[in-house]
Each structure stands twice: as C-alpha cells, then as structure tokens.
Amino acid sequence: MAKEGGRTAPCCSRPKVAALTVGTLLFLTGIGAASWAIVTILLRSDQEPLYQVQLSPGDSRLLVLDKTEGTWRLLCSSRSNARVAGLGCEEMGFLRALAHSELDVRTAGANGTSGFFCVDEGGLPLAQRLLDVISVCDCPRGRFLTATCQDCGRRKLPVDRIVGGQDSSLGRWPWQVSLRYDGTHLCGGSLLSGDWVLTAAHCFPERNRVLSRWRVFAGAVARTSPHAVQLGVQAVIYHGGYLPFRDPTIDENSNDIALVHLSSSLPLTEYIQPVCLPAAGQALVDGKVCTVTGWGNTQFYGQQAVVLQEARVPIISNEVCNSPDFYGNQIKPKMFCAGYPEGGIDACQGDSGGHFVCEDRISGTSRWRLCGIVSWGTGCALARKPGVYTKVIDFREWIFQAIKTHSEATGMVTQP
C-alpha cells in the first residue's frame, strides 16, 4: 500500500512521507469451590494473560484482579457508579460505558470467597485507572456494580485470512473509513464510535480546512463503491503539540493525531463497526505482526488503490528503528516503526491516518485494537525505511478528554 507525507507539502516534494504497499471470564457464584475453579481458568498461562479489569459474561459484572491474592473481586456500588463504569470501560479500551446497574449480593449469589473492592470516590476526578481508587472491603451496602461498554474491535461477518499486500474484502476492517476532500481520497481513518474518527493531524493542513468540503466514507472496500455511507464533518480536533502546524519548516512529526467529529452518527452494521483502543498500560510487543490497511498508492509513484489494501507487518523496536541504518534517532517516544528490514511491504501516499491494528484476547474474546496511526516514512517499502506510526497507547487520555470536552464544537479545534 502507500503513504501520504506527515507534512503539509505535497507527498513527493520531500523525502518523508506516510502510507501501504504491496478465557473464560470469572462468573462469581458465591460457592468457594466453583469460584476457585473459574479463577484457575482465568489465570491459565497458555494464552496471553487477561487484562486486570474484566466484564463477566451474562450479567456484565465489573471485575478487578487482586494481584496480591490472585483472585477477582467485584466492585461495590457507590454514588459514583456512572463514573466508575465509565472509567472501567475506558481502561479496558472501550470508548465509553453505555449503561450501568447494581446487583444485590444476597440475591445474585456473588457473596463468595473472591471478595470485593470499594471505590475511593474522592479520588475519582483525577483517576485514570480503577486500581488508583480501589481497596479491599466487605461491600457494606450489599450491592455491586455491572456495566455495559460500547462494543468494539469485533467483526460481525466471518472472513478469510489474507496474508499481506492484497485486496481486502467487505467486513474485514469495518472500522476503516476514507477521508475525502472535494471528493478526492486524502487520508484513512478509524471509527471509534458511530460519530468519532481517529486519524492523523497532518491530514488537515491550512489548505484543507474548509470542513464543508470534507466527507467521510464508511462501509465499503472499493473506493468508488456506490454503496458506501457518507457523512459530513462537524469538527476536527487536532493535537496542539503537532509542531508543523505552528511552523511548517519544523521537521518533527510527534503528536500526529486528530479526531474527526461527524455531522451525525453512522449506522453500525456488519460493514461499519468501531475499533477498540489499547487497554490502559498495554505495551506494544516488538516483533508482533499486526495489520495496516489503506487505499494509498501501491507504489511510491503509482496510482491509488481502487480496493482497500491490507498488509501484515511486524513491529520494530525503537532501538533498531533509531539506528543509523534506519532513521538515525528520528523516532520519538510517541512513535513506532513497523515493517520489514528488506522493505517490500509498507504504507504509502494516501494511507496516512489509517489504522495499524493488532488482535488480542486480553478481554476474554478476540478483539482488534488501534495501536498505531499511519504517520510518515521515507519513500514507500524501501529497505531499512519502514513505516512510522503514531503510538495510540500514549494518547488514550488525550482522546478521552478531547471527546468529552469538544463534543459540541464546530470547525478546527486544538486540544493540548
């Protein structure tokens, strides 16, 4: 596939450009033996470990792992249930909580050996994780919290696996959208919900800031598909630390991230679904093979792809990517590289803002998480010049804060 430059200049006027070439959850019953058996399953080591916050299947009890005891505890209900449910959902990588409720420990059968956590409500306003504000307790109110999070990162259609550099198929990447200015595809983006898209800041230079001329296309893999759903743009919130917007001569692409608020909400279907964010504290794993997609150029000087392209590429450590043979200390802490040392498969012009997604099972079921945003690179698919991505895990709080702060905003908005 191909990459659009992480700059405001035309994609071929400078060397740096961006784009894509060529388990079981704990179900508390109050019966000690049953609880212990389920905890044993949860802590099995043959798969990647479950994340430390979970929702139980069936009744969506909010569970937090007590690492000291090796057990899962329920969260006692409080006056701040809405905030606690929202914080729990966000921590797991969901965009928001859709609902919450209480269950009574005496009737729901959850007063077993696993125990409970209580919330320090005074610490909630500044908390970024549940573990910051909980402590073991006896649940004096006798009621505990359940939560419903906005679903994400799951395909609604069975799809075949494709191994890199090929046409994609409808429904494989239902969170991928096309951002078009005056009808021309300029960047990709990722749906976080029906009305929010995450993309790259460099997609919105001064010359492309008339929002009425932007349209977002979703639900299709063919760039010219008449069946795509399209919506207008209400606002673009870009990171205030993206320095080229302050001074176009600055050759520094940190904080290359922006949110697009749609004029209305897209209908969620088999072909339109949101992607998950990384869970709080979730680390990128060097060497892990993930997927980058886009409609960008299939060669550096080639044409844009007609059908959405996808490629599987491994994450490269920043140590390697900052070596003299690669990018020589140009990879900053909030960036990462992915690709092959020999080149051949990469992002390219037109893929900018698109997603780098990784699959995991830390929530007990398979989900795709948005780990990177196509940002920049040198050429396309060149040896030792892999694609460079914005590291989404480092912008989780920026994303949540921007959505909460600017949900009613219009036009171009800066979020520090």
Curated annotation (Swiss-Prot):
Those parts of the protein on the Extracellular side are 40-416
**Catalysed transformations (reactions):** Cleavage after basic amino-acid residues, with Arg strongly preferred to Lys
Q: List the disulfide bonds.
A: C76-C139, C89-C149, C118-C137, C152-C276, C187-C203, C290-C358, C321-C337, C348-C380
Looking up Pfam families in the UniProt record yields: Hepsin-SRCR, Trypsin
Protein location: Cell membrane; Apical cell membrane
Q: Does the keyword Isomerase apply?
A: no
**GO biological process terms on file:** basement membrane disassembly; cholesterol homeostasis; cochlea morphogenesis; detection of mechanical stimulus involved in sensory perception of sound; epithelium development; negative regulation of apoptotic process; negative regulation of epithelial cell proliferation; negative regulation of epithelial to mesenchymal transition
EC number, as in UniProt: 3.4.21.106
Side Cytoplasmic, residues: 1-18
User: How is the protein disposed in the membrane?
Assistant: Single-pass type II membrane protein
Carbohydrate-modified residues are N111
Q: Which family does it belong to?
A: Belongs to the peptidase S1 family.
Protein's name in the database? Serine protease hepsin
Please name the gene that encodes this protein. Hpn
